[in-house]
Amino acid sequence: SQVDQYEDAIPVLQKLIEQDPSSKLAYRKLAEASKATDDLEKAAKAYEELFKIDPRDIRVAISISDVYLENDDYRLALKWADKASSLDDKVGDGLGQKGKVYYYGWDNFRQNPFTNDDRLIAKLAYDYFIKAERKGYRGFSKSAWLKENEKDILYGKAQWFMAEDKVK
């Protein structure tokens, strides 16, 4: 099976990296193989080593964020999305990744009925998606759905006026 092929490739890639610790391709392939075999921690570590070799590669920062997101580590997913958005503010990919992290966090932790915190996180996701799309981002986005359901989901004037003074 394909998983077996990935499992067989991992020790070979590790040996390659021992021989040439600057091999971007070997780190990328190790990360992909680790992800395919569901070893998300090893995948994240391989991507992080790749990022050390090429610390300006926004795609690698986003890949690291995605692996942490897949592993439900929202703190590290957001940290790497932040790093991605700080690398290049001309493209919206990093901002889109931040929107994605906030959206998945909201989707995973929201309560019924929504709390103000839930609404704030949904609003952050929406705002980052919109900022990203204005910069040409075309990746994962729930901005249209969030906008369509904003009265029910997003933090807005109704919640602001209902908030206690100490919150404002």
Predicted regions mapped to residue ranges:
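Short coil/turn linking the two alpha-helices of tandem helical-hairpin repeats
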Residues: V3, L69-D72, G99, Y104-D117, ...
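Canonical positions in the second alpha-helix
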Residues: L16, E49-L50, K83-A84, A132
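TPR alpha-solenoid repeat register
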Residues: A26, A43, V60, G94, ...
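Residue-level recognition of tetratricopeptide repeat
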Residues: S23, R56-D57, K90-V91, G136-F140
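Terminal, low-structured helical/coil segments at or just beyond the last alpha-helical repeat
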Residues: Y126, K131-K168
